[in-house]
């Protein structure tokens, strides 16, 4: 079980010690599955996890749905492939600019890509959408040519937004200060995650207000936070509009935060694992 930051109400990364314990408790396991990063931008020590798994002759599979951009900016957390993972699924449509549903499965040295392709053909359609495939190729080319500068711009806009939002009061737009070397080994600063309980408002309330009153659609809201996904297509004007709307919400809708739910989680009972 991963740790929880009860103040923010977010799940943190898996630690090397937790992976080692899981390996010892499940000697018949053949692979380790990790996220890089989480929805909120939390990154585990993936290099050490890969090293540990490989020492036990296990493969490392990475859910990198929210990490396409990690391959194009050296100032961001390490990508799965650079960390030595065996396979990684990246959702190009999330931060890479391709059409929704389009993703790429990456394989590293030591993985038989032809065999992987054969298994994929047995488990999903062999008549893929050429709209999705062509969008992947176009976005791949765009990132190959302009990825570094595009995500540098995204990082700058996210850091600017973080600073401006924290000056409003009541919000907490968190970033690299969460890094503790274990459960938060690194942080993806392109994620604009904002804690809202200081306003006396749940994240989902702020999410609804942004959409219904300000015509701003962000990624999601939960009990404690909102997440704005800054893309390579966003402009500084879009960031200013978001910051202005959040300032407005603070001024108009702020409530007494007494009695607000905490961010504690209850682990469900696992009857049978997948």
Predicted features by range, described:
Residues 163-166, 177-183, 188-274:
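Non-catalytic terminal extensions of PLP-dependent enzymes
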Residues 1-178:
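Conserved PLP-enzyme active-site core in the AAT-like
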């Amino acid at each position: 079980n991963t740790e929880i930051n009860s103040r923010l109400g977010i799940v943190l990364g898996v630690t090397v010690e937790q992976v080692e314990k899981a390996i010892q408790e499940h000697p018949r396991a053949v692979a380790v599955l990790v996220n890089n990063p989480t929805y909120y931008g939390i990154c585990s020590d993936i290099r050490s996890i890969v090293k540990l798994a490989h020492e036990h002759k296990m493969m490392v599979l990475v859910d990198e749905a929210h990490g396409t951009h990690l391959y194009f900016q050296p100032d961001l957390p390490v990508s799965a492939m650079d960390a030595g993972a065996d396979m990684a699924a990246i959702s190009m449509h999330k931060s890479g600019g391709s059409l929704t549903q389009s993703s790429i499965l990456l394989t590293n040295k030591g993985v038989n890509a032809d065999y992987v392709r054969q298994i994929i053909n047995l488990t999903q359609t062999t008549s893929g959408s050429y709209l999705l495939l062509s969008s992947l190729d176009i976005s791949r080319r765009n990132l190959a040519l302009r990825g570094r500068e595009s995500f540098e711009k995204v990082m700058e806009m996210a850091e600017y937004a973080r600073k401006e939002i924290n000056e409003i009061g009541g919000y907490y737009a968190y970033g690299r200060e969460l890094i503790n070397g274990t459960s938060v080994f690194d942080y993806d600063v392109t994620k604009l995650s904002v804690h809202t309980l200081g306003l006396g408002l749940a994240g989902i309330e702020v999410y609804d207000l942004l959409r219904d009153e300000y015509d701003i659609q962000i990624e999601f809201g939960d009990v404690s936070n909102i997440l704005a996904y800054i893309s390579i297509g966003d402009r500084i004007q879009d960031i200013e509009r978001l910051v202005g709307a959040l300032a407005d919400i603070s001024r108009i809708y702020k409530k007494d935060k007494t009695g607000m739910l905490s961010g504690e989680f209850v682990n469900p009972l696992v009857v049978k694992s997948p």
